[in-house]
């Protein structure tokens, strides 16, 4: 991902304030609510029958935290996203058979959740920088798909 120094600083500064536990669970939960077909990848998570069930589900929260942990690793390696996400790309492609379009959806949901949490601090410039990052991460996660 090519970010200007200002964009990189904006992404890093905001990410330092992110509560990964809270934002991760909320982002994954919103993905599962807004795009219910994504729930099929999470059969083992138990009750996902309503928005409240999804948002209160401890397995959704735990996996959301794990997802944002991986995203944090990506932020530390913006110059090598494909390498950073190579194993996760293989896992999601070969074993989990996740449609790579879902990575784009989750990235967009994450941007919305960040905007909700940070309000005026999430300026159009910060949003534009995060859109570049989530697009780069989605592309890296889709890299191993044939």
Curated annotation (Swiss-Prot):
GO cellular component, one term: blood microparticle
Organism: Piliocolobus badius (Western red colobus)
Modified residues (N6-acetyllysine): 59, 82, 144
Residues with N-acetylvaline modification: 1
CDD domains: Hb-beta-like
GO molecular function, one term: peroxidase activity
Subunit structure: Heterotetramer of two alpha chains and two beta chains.
Protein name: Hemoglobin subunit beta
InterPro entries from the UniProt entry: Globin (IPR000971), Globin-like_sf (IPR009050), Globin/Proto (IPR012292), Hemoglobin_b (IPR002337), Hemoglobin_oxygen_transport (IPR050056)
Domain of life of the native organism: Eukaryota
Biological process annotations from GO: hydrogen peroxide catabolic process
Record key words, sorted: Acetylation, Heme, Iron, Metal-binding, Oxygen transport, Phosphoprotein, S-nitrosylation, Transport
Keyword Phosphoprotein: yes
PTM annotation (Phosphoserine): residues: 44
């Amino acid at each position: 991902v090519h970010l200007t120094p200002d964009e990189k600083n904006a992404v890093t500064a905001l990410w330092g304030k992110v509560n990964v536990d809270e934002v991760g669970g909320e982002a994954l939960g919103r993905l599962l609510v807004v795009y219910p077909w994504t729930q099929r990848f999470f059969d083992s998570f138990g009750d996902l029958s309503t928005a409240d069930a999804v948002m209160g589900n401890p397995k959704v929260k735990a996996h959301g935290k794990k997802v944002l942990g991986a995203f944090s690793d990506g932020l530390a390696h913006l110059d090598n996203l494909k390498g950073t996400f190579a194993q996760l790309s293989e896992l999601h492609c070969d074993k989990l058979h996740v449609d790579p379009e879902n990575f784009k959806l989750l990235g967009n949901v994450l941007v919305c959740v960040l905007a909700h949490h940070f309000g005026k601090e999430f300026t159009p410039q910060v949003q534009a920088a995060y859109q570049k990052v989530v697009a780069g991460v989605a592309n890296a996660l889709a890299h191993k798909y044939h």
